[in-house]
Amino acid sequence: MAVQQNKKTPSKRGMRRAHDVLKKPTFSVDFSSGETHRRHHVTPDGYYRGKKVIFSKDENEEENE
């Protein structure tokens, strides 16, 4: 089993942990509905880049009639 020869200093420990931070997700505003959503993700209403991409059952029935 590997054993360290010398104790790591708090400075070196901090330098190692410098890259462990988590970034906050980036949000955008949809220009058709004005809704906030994550970048490159579909809005909760089913819009992506101004176009409806996910249709609910009710919307499918309305289009068929």
Swiss-Prot record:
Biological processes per GO annotation: translation
Keyword annotations: Ribonucleoprotein, Ribosomal protein
NCBIfam families per the UniProt record, alphabetical: rpmF_bact (TIGR01031)
Originating gene: rpmF
PANTHER family in alphabetical order: 50S RIBOSOMAL PROTEIN L32 (PTHR35534), LARGE RIBOSOMAL SUBUNIT PROTEIN BL32 (PTHR35534:SF1)
Sequence similarity: Belongs to the bacterial ribosomal protein bL32 family.
Any one Gene Ontology molecular-function term assigned to this protein's record: structural constituent of ribosome
Cystines in this chain: none
Protein name (database record): Large ribosomal subunit protein bL32
Highest rank taxon of the organism: Bacteria
Pfam family, one: Ribosomal_L32p
Region span, Disordered: 1-45
GO cellular component: large ribosomal subunit
